[in-house]
Amino acid sequence: MSGFVEKPEPIQVPGLVHLHTGKVRELYRNEAGDLVMVASDRISAYDWVLPTEIPDKGRVLTQLSLWWFDQLADLAPNHVLSTELPPGAPADWEGRALVCKSLRMVPVECVARGYLTGSGLAEYDETRTVCGLALPEGLVDGSELPAPIFTPATKAEVGEHDENVSYEEVARQVGADTAAALRQATLAVYSRARDIARERGIVLADTKFEFGFDGDDLVLADEVLTPDSSRFWPADRWQPGRAQPSYDKQFVRDWLTSAESGWDRKSEQPPPPLPQQVVDATRAKYVEAYELLTGQSWS
């Protein structure tokens, strides 16, 4: 069992039709047919959306995505139309709501990996491959790959796992031309972002993109290069052969699997609320990632 510990009731706004509640975002459609995407402060771990929120998290995700969209504008068009608050929207949406183009979304999570860790490491340890791509012997947790690789995954519903799939399977699902365009765009955007992050003392280990079509044009959508969609590591502490310190929700994962939480991940019981010190530490990591990458003060 997994999903929401406490599923939220979406806010109703005149002129907006609520379409979907995701792990973090609420999705609406306005009267012009555009989408309104609102990033909440919800946080998920181990396929559960937790009952405790992380203050400012949704704003950090939104503002960091906007910053990255600017850095990548010459490489990939994006879906953002406006950052203005829709009429009648609550003040709390300020800084976390985006008006976006309605796209024909491609049903593939486009993952780029420059370093080996996570599910890629688990697959490599068994087969010496990731998503069907052969990799050299001798790689360990945190190893830099000879070149970035495209390792797509299926898009799962809330509470379900994304599943890694081969490039050939993606080509069967969406067509050879679209698969090739996804791979090219994913690796180009990752490579640009990796270099920008490296200049700021951050290793971009891997990241996940979503794309959709606006007519015949492939457009970058959803969030980009945030601590929710990426693994960011401090470059000065990168050391292959161990789990890397990171700018993300690792504090949450570590506490949930500790004796202190009293939660058995293998049980079907929902996880407990987070203690304040874990909330504060997690918020600080998200803000630190924003400040290091953008060079701007959050407060």
UniProtKB/Swiss-Prot annotation:
NCBIfam families: PRK13961.1, purC. The keyword ATP-binding applies. It is an enzyme of class 6 (ligase). One of its GO terms (biological process) is 'de novo' IMP biosynthetic process. Belongs to the SAICAR synthetase family. The lineage of its organism: Bacteria, Bacillati, Actinomycetota, Actinomycetes, Kitasatosporales. The gene is purC. Keywords: ATP-binding, Ligase, Nucleotide-binding, Purine biosynthesis. One of its GO terms (molecular function) is ATP binding. PANTHER family: PHOSPHORIBOSYLAMINOIMIDAZOLE-SUCCINOCARBOXAMIDE SYNTHASE. It holds the Pfam family SAICAR_synt. Pathway: Purine metabolism; IMP biosynthesis via de novo pathway; 5-amino-1-(5-phospho-D-ribosyl)imidazole-4-carboxamide from 5-amino-1-(5-phospho-D-ribosyl)imidazole-4-carboxylate: step 1/2. The keyword ATP-binding applies. This is Phosphoribosylaminoimidazole-succinocarboxamide synthase. HAMAP family: SAICAR_synth (MF_00137). It catalyses: 5-amino-1-(5-phospho-D-ribosyl)imidazole-4-carboxylate + L-aspartate + ATP = (2S)-2-[5-amino-1-(5-phospho-beta-D-ribosyl)imidazole-4-carboxamido]succinate + ADP + phosphate + 2 H(+).
